[in-house]
From Swiss-Prot:
Sequence ranges of Basic residues compositional bias: 138-147
Domain Helicase ATP-binding as annotated: residue spans: 8-421
Entries under CDD domains matching the protein: SF2_C_XPD
Xref: InterPro entries: ATP-dep_Helicase_C, DinG/Rad3-like, DNA/RNA_helicase_DEAH_CS, Helic_SF1/SF2_ATP-bd_DinG/Rad3, Helicase-like_DEXD_c2, P-loop_NTPase, RAD3-like_helicase_DEAD, Rad3/Chl1-like
Disordered: region residues: 130-167
Broad class of where this protein is predominantly found: nucleus
Protein name: ATP-dependent DNA helicase CHL1
Gene3D superfamilies per UniProt: P-loop containing nucleotide triphosphate hydrolases
Keyword line: ATP-binding, Cell cycle, DNA-binding, Helicase, Hydrolase, Iron, Iron-sulfur, Isomerase, Metal-binding, Nucleotide-binding, Nucleus
Length: 835
């Protein structure tokens, strides 16, 4: 049911009649921004309209702010104003007339801009229709064309001659350099020559960031449903939205796209092409002052476009959308961008994204700390180092005579560094000096060698300036594809970018990070990991007016306060957890502590108990007998799931399960996930048979996959999925937490409790993420079984999402009682559906 944007009961201009919990969430977000909170922590279960609630509350606040602070006669003109035209000597009617004139000018300027956007949008669509490129008033999305394979020659893989900062380039054209510098200065002085010169009088923007491309596209589609009251008079104010993407999403140059295989590569290829004589055909040399790029930036604001539609605009206009859209940043109200751009201060500066005094909204924020950590971490093994050395030697052998001395010397030094790292790992293994999680003193890598003469600072600068990594990677790919099997073993895309990242960490190790030993499947590695993500996030928190963190599974929220912004006072943090939109009787949550008098506790020491594994099988058989349609079972790991299934295959447990429901297993290969899901859904929906899906916490199906309606009538969580306590990451992180606690004056026992709490919270966030997969809309219903006696603990229950916690059966039911209630639950739902 749609409501008018002007009606009092629809304060937030929601496109539909909002549910009570949506109004509560919108109220909480608006209050957080309006009352000066620095941080807002919000949990809203998936399926409750979280994205629209975020959009409506933040945009309503922004329009209110603009109306009161930009387009009001008193805005910015208080008694301290010293302008002679509004002095205390003037009569009040003169002051009012002056203020009205200022506001009128601002409003007229915005009215003109709105009309201009309407005009260019209509012109563009008419031109496209005339050309026969669209068939409706809203252009259907065109499939982006696949890059054609470009013919690449050896010269394409050569870097420019390299000279360090202390070297002088021979025959440097000083006049050319001077002319370039003068041209840049003139650009700054003259500014751009816009068809309509516009400046944004409102310093506040909304930045919406999420983890994946699909989530950002969904945001654009939800935003397109909305319409908000204008902040000024005279014309309807459109929502000015700009999606910021990477070159990989926005590049329209086929040569660049065919040359590049990953994000780092495409950036280097693009910059390299701009420096070349021919340049990029889609990027005007003076693109900052180009009317074509200006028009594309304005067109991008004329209506809500997702990132593919922005790329299509650029293709149709034959102008680079990546560089053009950034010109529209100044006039936007709301900008969407991926985590990687938001969290990089240097990238924000390049794109002219000013978060000062703005609202920063981070969706799916349960991923935020992991994303920050992974962006500033790197891991490298002997095998990878050997592959890098092979690639470097192969490249040098081919181009040795064509490379200048600067490139040759630095590439040989890079080989030397890789050999030193290999030697260091091998010596440490021989001396039994490797203990997973133990810190590495990087100076030990050069011990008893001439490695300290390499000057890794200069080496890192060489890799950064020369952009040689993508040249080598691309050449190795070409040779591997066309000629030489040896090169195939040498090609290890994108390992050269990994050594670049490794060198950056060696050169500038953060005091909040550590180098340490790690091991995966018996393979030793050196790992650098950022241990304190708050140091990176502080830049955003300190600059923004307000930071809103939202997610479907934000509990335990204490983790964010402790590790992401420990410096923010509690009184400046607002937390809010939504209930679910479903009626209270549409979800039951049962802790399952025992079966056949066997206690179910899947702790590390007890998890292989054969009696308990048999009891687990009996429990799942009974659940399959009582629950219709689909059942999803989550195990702590692939290894444990396979172990359990192998035991059940040797007994009759799997036979009993398969007599009730068709069995599916989560594949380890991502390419097989959609096939398994389709078969699972088809069995339930089309064949009208029951099915059971064995999945893994943190696997392919625990996040982003929805088991709505009959696909997930029950979710079974087996045990508490603690991460591997003996992994290098966990050991290093817990040591860091303990050392930080002791530095603050805590006792050793308090410090250990802090690190144990962190470890437990990792587990509970994974639980919340997995069990939230089943309820997707207001009429959905399901049962959650938490199979482990430890779920009876109030400490564990308090770390579950609030909407789950509120529905836990607190009576200590045995399995017979749970199954009786299960049958009653589904019988009632069947009767209600048929009534």
């Amino acid at each position: 049911m749609e409501t008018s944007i002007c009606s009092p009961e629809n304060r937030y201009s929601h496109p539909y009649k909002p549910y009570d919990i949506q109004i509560q969430l919108m109220d909480a977000i608006y209050d957080t921004i309006d009352n000066g909170y620095k941080i807002g922590l919000f949990e809203s279960p998936t399926g409750t309209g979280k994205t629209l609630s975020i959009i409506c509350s933040t945009m309503t606040w922004l329009r209110d702010y603009k109306r009161e602070n930009v387009f009001q006669p008193m805005a910015g003109l208080d008694g301290s104003d010293t302008d002679d035209s509004d002095s205390d000597d003037e009569p009040e009617w003169v002051k009012k007339a002056y203020r009205d004139t200022i506001v009128s000018r601002s409003e007229n300027k915005m009215v003109d801009y709105e009309m201009y956007l309407e005009k260019i949008q209509n012109e563009y669509e008419n031109n496209i229709q005339t050309a026969g490129s669209i068939k409706s008033s809203r252009p259907p999305k065109k499939k982006r064309s696949t890059a054609k394979k470009q013919e690449l020659h050896d010269e394409d893989f050569l870097p420019e001659d390299y000279y360090s900062d202390s070297e002088v380039k021979p025959n440097a054209d000083k006049l050319t350099v001077l002319e370039s510098e003068i041209s840049q200065l003139l650009d700054k002085v003259n500014g751009r020559t816009d068809e309509i010169e516009m400046t944004n009088d409102c310093p506040v923007n909304i930045y919406f960031s999420s983890r994946t491309h699909s989530q950002l596209n969904q945001f654009a589609h939800q935003l397109a449903l909305t319409k908000f009251q204008s902040s000024f008079k005279g014309v309807e104010e459109r929502t000015k939205y700009l999606p910021i993407g990477s070159r990989k999403q926005l590049c329209i140059n086929e040569k660049v796209k065919s040359f590049s295989k990953n994000d780092s590569n495409i950036n280097d290829v693009c910059v390299d092409l701009q420096k070349s004589k021919e340049g990029c055909q889609f990027l005007p040399k003076d693109y900052l002052n180009s009317s074509l790029t200006k028009k594309l930036s304005d067109l991008s604001l004329s209506k809500i476009h997702d990132i593919e539609e922005i790329a299509d605009l650029g293709s149709n206009m034959k102008v680079c959308p990546y560089y053009s859209v950034r010109k529209g940043v100044e006039m936007t109200e709301i900008i969407s961008l991926p985590y990687q751009i938001l969290l990089s201060e240097s990238t924000r500066a390049i794109l002219n994204l000013q978060i000062e005094d703005s609202i920063v909204v981070i969706d799916e924020a349960h991923n935020l700390m992991d994303t920050i950590t992974s962006m500033h971490s790197v891991c490298i093994t002997i095998g990878e180092m050997n592959s890098i050395i092979k690639a470097l030697k192969f490249y040098l052998g081919r181009f040795l005579k064509k490379l200048n001395s600067g490139n040759r010397i630095h590439l040989m030094k890079l080989i030397k560094l890789c050999q030193l790292v290999i030697s260091f790992i091998q010596k440490s293994e021989k001396c039994n000096n490797i203990k997973v999680g133990n810190e590495i003193n990087t100076s030990d890598i050069y011990q008893n060698s001439t490695g300290d003469m390499l000057n890794i600072h200069i080496l890192e600068a060489f890799l950064a300036k020369s952009k040689i990594a993508y040249k080598i990677e691309s050449y190795m790919e070409k040779v591997a594809e066309n000629e030489n099997e040896q090169a195939k073993t040498s090609s290890s895309n994108p390992l050269l970018y990994k050594i670049v990242q490794f060198l950056k960490c060696l050169v500038n190790p953060s005091k909040e990070g550590k180098f340490f030993w790690d091991s995966t499947n018996g393979i030793t590695s050196i790992k650098y990991m950022l241990l304190d993500p708050s140091s990176v996030f502080k830049d955003i928190v300190s600059k923004a007016r307000c930071v809103i963190l939202c997610g479907g599974t934000m509990e335990p929220m204490s983790e964010f306060k402790n590790f992401l912004f420990p410096y923010v006072e509690d009184k400046k943090i607002k937390s809010f957890s939504c209930n679910h939109i479903i009626p209270p009787d549409n979800l039951k949550v049962y802790p399952v502590s025992s079966q056949n008098n066997v206690t179910l506790e899947f702790s590390f020491d007890n998890r292989n108990n054969p009696l308990m594994i048999e009891a687990l099988g009996a429990s799942i058989v009974r659940i399959c007998q009582s629950v219709p349609d689909g059942v999803v079972v989550f195990f702590p790991s692939y290894k444990y799931m396979n172990h359990i299934l192998s035991i059940w295959k040797s007994t009759d447990v799997l036979t009993q399960i398969e007599s009730q429901k068709k069995l599916f297993e989560e594949p380890t290969s991502a390419s097989q996930v959609q096939t398994i899901l389709a078969d699972y859904a088809n069995t339930i929906k089309e064949e009208k048979k029951g099915a059971i899906l064995f999945s893994v916490v943190g696997g392919k199906m625990s996040e982003g996959i929805n088991f709505a309606d009959e696909l997930g009538r029950a979710v079974v969580m087996v045990g508490l999925p603690y991460p591997n306590a003996y992994s290098g990451e966990i050991i290093a992180k817990r040591k860091f937490i303990e050392s930080e606690a002791i530095a603050r004056g805590c006792s050793m026992s308090e410090a250990q409790r802090n690190s144990q709490s962190y470890y437990e919270n990792l587990c509970m966030r994974a639980v919340n993420q997995s069990i939230g997969r089943s309820i997707r809309h207001i009429n959905d219903y399901s049962i959650i079984y938490l199979v482990d006696c430890r779920y009876q603990s109030s400490r564990i229950q308090n770390k579950l999402s609030s909407w789950v916690r509120k529905r836990i059966e607190t009576r200590n039911y045995n399995m017979d009682q749970i199954m009786e209630e299960t049958r009653d639950f589904f019988m009632c739902k069947t009767i209600a559906r048929l009534a």
